[in-house]
Regions:
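Structural signature of the two symmetry-related core transmembrane helices
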Residues: 65-79, 275-290
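Helix-breaking motifs and short loop linkers at transmembrane-helix boundaries and internal kinks
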Residues: 62, 83-88, 294-295
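Helix-to-loop junctions at the C-terminal end of transmembrane segments
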Residues: 50-62, 260-273
């Protein structure tokens, strides 16, 4: 597992460095809020388009080669941003990076699920979440600040850090061979291909439809949370009149998300996930509403309120990520972990992309406060889905 965590940290370093800065680069080239919102929106659209094919790629080529390809696609285009600040070029780089990010996200969570016994999934997801969150804690707030003090080039250089994860792929490949994890991917394919008709005849319904039904609730809840997070990560540097407030807000957001995602996993292993979901949904709604209030006056950000609001959303953002992945894995059998991981990651990235595009589009026509209130209303609409009982597969 350490090899997977190191590789994941490297990959997400490249992802996090550019997340708030690539939209700023588009604004530097003349794009408006809507155009800059599409930078991350298209990144995640390409991610979502890639993710359904990743389980097949893992079975066909193996985990280490697929991960290496993903890291190259994610980190390689970063320095190419320096060629042009025009929106079309930046969007093309977003597509390439999205391919790599789609591979990294599904492969990482699927491999994690197979490496760790189900009884320890919550704690393992917490550790995996920390390897994702720590780079974001450092690089999300640092990115806009580094642009101000040193220029865009240094952030684009940091974005290439994903390629450093290649050093851990041989180590991970050896661990997977020792634990015979690759065989599990092939066993899953065999079960899916030979057992689907038998299961369907016995139950009177298609098994994939039943799986989709089980995964729908956690996926929609996840989308409500990541819509909020995607909006704040993309636009915090643009919605605050004080650059240091934007950096501080992103720092509060990412630290809160990291701690929440890390700590809640082991707690959920003991008490279950559902008890914590509805309070976290409400926390996200309150945080978004307070953010809207903090940036009501474009020229005078209420800095303290802004920091508190982003921290509240961060707690919800991190906690809901962990709990919904735990519920998704618990809703399926072990040979369906690849499907559950792909669906969860699609929900994560769809919510993030929708938040980026939706809030950017509304802000371009109105302003950020009403855009954030719309995001809060969407998150609130997921609340009825946050009440449930534990299910054991």
């Amino acid at each position: 597992m350490p090899a997977l965590l190191l590789l994941t940290a490297a990959g997400f370093s490249g992802y996090a460095a550019l997340l708030p800065v690539a939209p700023l680069w588009a604004v530097h080239g003349g794009a408006d809020e809507a155009g800059s919102g599409f930078v991350n929106g298209l990144l995640l659209l390409a991610t979502i388009a890639t993710q359904p094919f990743v389980p097949w790629l893992l079975r066909r080529f193996g985990t280490a080669p697929v991960l290496a390809t993903g890291l190259l696609f994610l980190g390689g285009p970063s320095l190419l941003h320096l060629i042009s600040d025009q929106l079309g070029w930046i969007l093309a780089m977003s597509v390439l990076r999205g391919f790599g990010f789609g591979i990294l996200t599904v492969t990482g969570s699927t491999t994690l699920a197979h490496l760790v016994p189900p009884a320890r999934h919550g704690a393992a997801i917490g550790a995996y979440g920390a390897s994702i969150a720590v780079p974001q804690v450092v690089l999300l707030p640092a990115g806009p600040w580094l642009v101000d003090v040193a220029g865009y080039w240094i952030v684009f250089a940091l974005g290439a850090a994903s390629i450093l994860g290649l050093a851990a792929t041989p180590w991970l490949a050896r661990v997977l061979r020792e634990q015979d994890v690759e065989r599990l991917f092939h066993d899953a394919a065999a079960v899916d291909s030979t057992g689907a008709d038998i299961q369907a005849q016995a139950s009177g319904s298609h098994p994939q439809r039943r799986i989709a039904g089980r995964l729908a609730r956690p996926t929609i809840l996840l989308m409500g949370a990541t819509l909020a997070g995607g909006a704040l990560i993309t636009f915090a540097p643009q919605m605050s009149s004080a650059p240091l407030a934007a950096a501080g807000g992103l720092a509060f957001f990412t630290v809160a998300a990291a701690v929440s995602r890390w700590r809640i996993g082991s707690i959920a292993d003991r008490y279950g996930a559902w008890a914590f979901l509805w309070p976290l949904v409400l926390l996200a709604v309150v945080g978004l509403a307070l953010t809207a209030l903090a940036v009501e006056n474009p020229g005078d950000t209420k800095v303290t309120l802004f920091l508190v609001a982003l921290a509240l959303v961060g707690i919800a953002y991190g906690g809901i990520q962990n709990l919904t992945l735990l519920l998704s894995l618990g809703a399926v059998s072990r040979n369906q972990y690849g499907t559950a991981s792909a669906v969860w990651n699609i929900g994560f990235d769809a919510g993030t992309g929708i938040g980026s595009v939706l809030v950017g589009t509304i802000a371009a026509g109105l302003s950020f406060p009403p855009a954030l209130l719309v995001a809060a209303a969407i998150s609130l609409a997921t609340l009825p889905l946050a009440f449930g009982r534990e299910r054991h597969s």
